[in-house]
Amino acid sequence: MLKLRLKRCGRKQRAVYRIVAIDVRSRREGRDLRKVGFYDPIKNQTCLNVPAILYFLEKGAQPTRTVSDILRKAEFFKEKERTLS
């Protein structure tokens, strides 16, 4: 089973996160299948690869609660409805 979850990057006291598609059994810093986005909580910046996220969601990937909150803030689900219509 796949998950869309955050992978910590950056340095001490300056965390930046990549949104990755990863196997459930892998640890947080484990090998990811694909990087599908980027999130900087300090600058409050988000960069999403929408086609890649849609691909993994169609394959059955489940986003974690934090990733789904990030996607909701970026109005990803509204875009998804537009692309499906």
UniProtKB/Swiss-Prot annotation:
Annotated transmembrane regions: none
Q: Name one GO cellular component term.
A: plastid
Q: What induces it?
A: Transcribed and spliced in green leaves.
Signal peptide positions on this chain = none
User: Tell me, which GO biological process terms does this entry list?
Assistant: translation
The answer, when asked if Ribonucleoprotein is one of the entry's keywords, is yes
Can the keyword Chloroplast be found in this entry's annotation?
Answer: yes
User: Where does this one sit in the cell?
Assistant: Plastid, Chloroplast
- GO terms for molecular function, please? structural constituent of ribosome
What keywords appear on the UniProt entry? Chloroplast, Plastid, Ribonucleoprotein, Ribosomal protein
Annotated Gene3D superfamilies: 3.30.1320.10
Instruction: List the Pfam families hit by this protein, alphabetically.
Output: Ribosomal_S16
Which NCBIfam families does the UniProt record give?
A: S16
Family named by the database record: Belongs to the bacterial ribosomal protein bS16 family.
Cited PANTHER family: 30S RIBOSOMAL PROTEIN S16, SMALL RIBOSOMAL SUBUNIT PROTEIN BS16M
Q: Which HAMAP family match?
A: Ribosomal_bS16 (MF_00385)
The protein's name is Small ribosomal subunit protein bS16c
